[in-house]
From Swiss-Prot:
<comment type="subunit">
    <text>Homotrimer. Interacts with the inner capsid protein VP2. Interacts with the outer capsid glycoprotein VP7. Interacts with the outer capsid protein VP5*.</text>
</comment>
<dbReference type="GO" id="GO:0039626">
    <property type="term" value="C:viral intermediate capsid"/>
</dbReference>
<keyword id="KW-0167">Capsid protein</keyword>
<feature type="binding site">
    <location>
        <position position="286"/>
    </location>
    <ligand>
        <name>Ca(2+)</name>
    </ligand>
</feature>
<keyword id="KW-0862">Zinc</keyword>
<keyword id="KW-1154">Intermediate capsid protein</keyword>
<keyword id="KW-0479">Metal-binding</keyword>
<dbReference type="Pfam" id="PF00980">
    <property type="entry name" value="Rota_Capsid_VP6"/>
</dbReference>
<dbReference type="InterPro" id="IPR008935">
    <property type="entry name" value="Virus_capsid_a-hlx_vir"/>
</dbReference>
<keyword id="KW-0832">Ubl conjugation</keyword>
<feature type="binding site">
    <location>
        <position position="153"/>
    </location>
    <ligand>
        <name>Zn(2+)</name>
    </ligand>
</feature>
<dbReference type="InterPro" id="IPR008980">
    <property type="entry name" value="Capsid_hemagglutn"/>
</dbReference>
<feature type="region of interest" description="Interaction with the inner capsid protein VP2">
    <location>
        <begin position="62"/>
        <end position="73"/>
    </location>
</feature>
<dbReference type="GO" id="GO:0019064">
    <property type="term" value="P:fusion of virus membrane with host plasma membrane"/>
</dbReference>
<protein>
    <recommendedName>
        <fullName>Intermediate capsid protein VP6</fullName>
    </recommendedName>
</protein>
<dbReference type="GO" id="GO:0046789">
    <property type="term" value="F:host cell surface receptor binding"/>
</dbReference>
<dbReference type="GO" id="GO:0005198">
    <property type="term" value="F:structural molecule activity"/>
</dbReference>
């Protein structure tokens, strides 16, 4: 993996900097590195593909070295270099696609394609010029079963979940009380509602709670907490739990009271925030517990009192909500990230070449299913293919 990264980094630099008119002295170190790569690769044969519709390709390396010059690089020099660069880029691209198409239930962190296994040999270590990538560093750590630490911005840590629970209901569905939520990606939105606006509740107050368990521990997280859940601020028709009928939800939004958010690790509270909104932080956690209250307004103007009558029918439904969004965090496991293209790159390659469903990844790389059942085998394989995708992204956009 280190060799593949070094190849890609060298080729990217060569493609960007070995251009007509450039002073040789400005790129002499890069050309020496490029020649070292050629010397190491010459005389070796590789094969890629042969899975799904990814065609089998044979690669033979027998290239001349780039020479020296006292002046600027001319057109002939650059054309010779480009021929070599393009062949190497095509090779790296195919090795990456071959690797992304493969998976294994055992030791999925290790190279799975024949080409990358061969590149892992001792004879190619002379190409190991640079391993400064976060993915490469953490792949090396995970390969040695040591602690990793990926920094994600908007990590897709929450499997998609859109549902509700009813604490009070009846067949007519005309006086409900409960909680509705939407968890997805890096965001939680939860709303508590009461058709009667806590009319007969103790102290005219309804208490709501929403608990979310993460599939992996997050650390040093920066989080935004807002006293609103905009996705639950408009009327909708909701299917009943048994699917036999539907019920009407017509929210009127109130501000939540006594808001508390707790971040827990192995059942122990690590951080707690009460009535604090905006930017908050959490040290390390695997569970989030949100609690908040809906209080019937003690003093209401006639217009507000008309919204919340003292008897049925309850046409308008009192609603309070919260939004919690993880803006950035560190995780020991690799995750999809809204700011990165790794998941999209891997999925597109597997779809384009009709890679058959294997023993590890779900069909279509379904992220909700993958993160819901995030086994060690999936974690190993995902870290490997995301690392390869990061390498490929240097050369292929």
């Amino acid at each position: 993996m280190d060799v593949l990264f070094s190849l890609s980094k060298t080729l990217k630099d060569a493609r960007d900097k070995i251009v007509e008119g450039t002073l040789y002295s400005n790129v002499s170190d890069l050309i020496q590195q490029f020649n070292q790569m050629i010397v190491t690769m010459n005389g070796n044969d590789f094969q890629t593909g042969g899975i799904g519709n990814l065609p089998v390709r044979n690669w033979n390396f027998d290239f001349g070295l780039l020479g020296t010059t006292l002046l600027n690089l001319d057109a002939n020099y650059v054309e010779t270099a480009r021929t070599t660069i393009n062949y190497f880029v095509d090779f790296v691209d195919n090795v990456c696609m071959d690797e992304m198409a493969r998976e294994s239930q055992r030791n999925g962190i290790a190279p799975q394609s024949d080409a990358l296994r061969k590149l892992s040999g001792i004879r190619f270590k002379r190409i190991n010029f640079d391993n400064s990538s976060e993915y490469i560093e953490n792949w090396n750590l995970q390969n040695r079963r040591q602690r990793t630490g990926f920094t994600f911005h908007k990590p897709n840590i929450f499997p998609y979940s859109f549902s509700f629970t009813l604490n009070r209901s009846q067949p007519q569905h005309d006086n409900l009380m409960g909680t509705m939520w939407l968890n997805a990606g890096s965001e939680i939105q939860v709303a508590g509602f009461d058709y009667s606006c806590a009319l007969n509740a103790p102290a005219n107050t309804q208490q709501f709670e929403h608990i979310v368990q993460l599939r992996r521990v997050l650390t040093t997280a920066t989080i935004t907490l807002l006293p609103d859940a905009e996705r639950f601020g408009f009327p909708r028709v909701v299917n009943s739990a048994d699917g036999a009928t539907t019920w009407y939800f017509n929210p009127v939004v109130l501000r939540p009271n006594n808001v508390e958010v707790e971040f827990l690790l192995n059942g122990q509270i690590i951080n707690t925030y009460q009535a604090r909104f905006g930017t908050i932080t959490a040290r390390n956690f695997d569970t989030i517990r949100l609690s908040f209250q809906l209080m019937r307004p003690p003093n209401m103007t006639p217009a507000v009192a008309a919204l919340f009558p003292n008897a049925q029918p309850f046409v308008h439904h009192a609603t309070v909500g919260l939004t919690l969004r993880i803006d950035s965090a560190v995780c020991e496991s690799v995750l999809a990230d809204a700011n990165e293209t790794m998941l999209a790159n891997v999925t597109s390659v597997r779809q384009e070449y009709a890679v058959p469903v294997g023993p590890v990844f779900p069909p279509g790389m379904n992220w909700t299913e993958l993160i819901t059942n995030y086994s060690p085998s999936r974690e190993d394989n995902l870290q490997r293919v995301f690392t390869v995708a990061s390498i490929r992204s240097m050369l292929v956009k």
